[in-house]
Design a protein with these regions (language model features):
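Short, surface-exposed coil-to-beta transition loops
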Residues: 58, 82-84, 102
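Long, distal/terminal scaffolding or interaction modules
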Residues: 79-83, 133-135
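Low-complexity or membrane-interfacial segments used for flexible interactions
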Residues: 1-29, 100-174
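Phosphate/anion-contacting hairpin/loop surfaces
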Residues: 96-98
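A glycine-rich, hydrophobic loop/mini-helix early in the fold
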Residues: 27-73
Length: 174
């Protein structure tokens, strides 16, 4: 089990757990992985998706925020980072999660708030750092931290191109 734990100003300790087996149905554990965020004053968020290495990927993902199902979608073939952003509908809000500078930098945003995240390393980070802007609250922070445990490389154009053959083969097998 890999986890990151640290203080978040005003919210206490927050923990990102990977893999979070408790969010994956027993019969799915061979093909799906899960990640979960918990904390003292933060709503629990969880995500499960098909495994890619040690992380769940966006394909066939299931997202839960504060005990409620949330919807996600993305446009994999858009040219711009903003166009390829993951769109999230959770707890009555609409978010976008996208890569910014490079594969170590991401941002979760909604009209009133933004949480910028940075990893010390793209693949196996020792440190995950975040900065909240605007009216960011515990739900925003929970989601931003959660997506740091999900394989999101295909939010970049190069990542989308690298993962394209696997996606096409997976669809051909359906």
């Amino acid at each position: 089990v890999t986890f990151w734990r640290g203080p978040v100003g005003g919210l206490g300790e927050v923990e990102l757990v990977l893999p979070a087996l408790e969010v994956v149905h027993l019969h799915d554990r061979g093909s799906r992985g899960g990640v979960m965020v918990t904390g003292e004053n933060i709503p629990m968020s969880s995500y499960s998706g098909l495994w890619y290495g040690a992380r769940p990927r966006l394909a066939e993902g299931r997202l839960s925020v504060a005990g409620q199902h949330a919807a996600i979608s993305r446009r994999a073939w858009r040219a711009s980072r903003k166009g390829r952003a993951l769109r999230v509908w959770a707890v009555g809000r609409e978010y976008k999660y996208r890569e910014t500078e490079n594969r170590r930098h991401h941002v979760l945003e909604r009209p009133e708030a933004q949480v910028a995240m940075t990893r010390s390393s793209w693949k196996n980070p020792d440190v995950i750092f975040g900065a909240a802007h605007g009216a960011a609250d515990s739900v925003d922070i929970s989601l931003a931290v959660l997506f740091e445990g999900v394989y999101t490389r295909n939010l970049s154009l190069s990542g989308a191109l690298i993962s394209a053959p696997g996606r096409l083969l997976a669809r051909a097998g359906d």
